[in-house]
């Protein structure tokens, strides 16, 4: 009797399991041309695993990078290793970190330059208030580049 009870309980646990509903999320592409990868996530590098996706830009610097969905700019950085970096939080719960950019768009570009002169330092970090720099899906947020520790435009 006990064996049947345990078997029935185990079957009920396996069949009736339901965690959470999968969200249906859509994104717009970050570029207005066909996407081709030049670097994959998890790819083995000389001293680490690659932590992102790199998209080819045809060897061109300065192509518009677009927001994938509605959201806001959550962090702005200029670093020696990653160059110009823009973090975006999207209202759908996802986020992106855009590295190696050639530049930012207005008004972020002006704010970064002002802070660089004030600090007399090329490396800066700005953490804006949530919603201070809102973005819409498809909006130009930066320019593709080759800054920092990068081996070609992407």
Predicted segments with their positions:
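Surface-exposed, glycine-biased beta-strand/turn segments
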Residues: 19-94, 102-107, 122-123, 129-131, ...
